[in-house]
């Protein structure tokens, strides 16, 4: 279903421009990190790519097709947990995707074990820790076998140990052949998990570069200031 092509994509709310004429192509292979200060438009851009939002102008197409959502998934910073067990949370998504109840239960159990949640799979999902809930959300998405997985700040609210577990799991998913596209504020995490950086500032795609080059020699004043930890200007 890749590449995903955005052509002059803009998104506005009540006249306020959130995404400003972004053109880019997301291809197979590389781990793509979307980086930028608060309010840069990272999460909105992810939702546009995923299909949760429609652009105000411009076009978004998967391999030339305007609707390619069937082979991709998204995990949010604060995932919604259904009022059922951890295992049933995963199985339910599989049933909605058209799998039989038996097939869904077996696949859900395999994935729950793979993400290290076997010991809590019968507990209500809503009583799990934040780190466990994030791994469960990743398990729900992974179980569907997506070609592309969008991750919106997946460790933003987690302690260091839980964040490490989630990073390890992201590596597992990527090793299985899934394309990772992820937002983060964490520069160290971007270095660890990314191959390329898409840097946003005030809704514009300011820079795109390999991770090492981006951090060693940013091509824009905005990116250089962001790396130094300076507050963005208006």
Task: Please provide the spans of the model-predicted regions.
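A short, surface-exposed alpha-helical micro-motif characterized by mixed small hydrophobic
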Residues: 190-192
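Helix-to-loop junction immediately C-terminal to a conserved catalytic motif
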Residues: 50
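Catalytic Walker B motif of ABC-type/P-loop ATPase nucleotide-binding domains
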Residues: 149-152
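Helix N-cap at the start of a conserved alpha-helix in ABC-type nucleotide-binding domains
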Residues: 160-162
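Conserved ABC ATPase signature
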Residues: 124-128, 132
């Amino acid at each position: 279903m890749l590449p995903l092509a955005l052509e002059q994509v803009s998104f506005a709310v009540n006249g306020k421009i959130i995404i400003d004429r972004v053109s880019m192509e997301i291809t197979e292979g590389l781990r793509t990190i979307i980086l930028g200060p608060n309010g840069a438009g990272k999460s909105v851009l992810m939702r546009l790519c995923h299909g949760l939002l429609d652009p105000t102008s411009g076009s978004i197409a998967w391999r030339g097709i305007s609707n390619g959502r069937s082979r991709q998934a998204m995990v949010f910073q604060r995932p919604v947990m259904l009022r059922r067990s951890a295992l049933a949370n995963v199985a339910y998504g599989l049933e909605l995707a058209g799998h039989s109840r038996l097939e869904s239960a077996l696949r859900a159990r395999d994935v729950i074990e793979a993400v290290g949640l076997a010991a809590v799979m019968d507990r209500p999902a809503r009583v799990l820790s934040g780190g466990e809930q994030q791994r469960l959300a990743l398990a729900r998405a992974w179980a569907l076998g997506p070609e592309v997985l969008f991750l919106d700040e997946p460790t933003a609210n987690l302690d260091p140990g839980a964040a490490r577990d989630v990073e390890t799991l992201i590596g597992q998913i990527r090793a299985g052949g899934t394309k990772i596209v992820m937002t983060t504020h964490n520069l160290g995490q971007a270095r660890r998990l990314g191959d390329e950086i898409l840097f946003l500032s005030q809704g514009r795609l300011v820079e795109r570069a390999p991770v090492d080059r981006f951090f060693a020699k940013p091509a824009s004043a905005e990116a250089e200031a962001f790396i130094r930890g300076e507050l963005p200007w208006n």
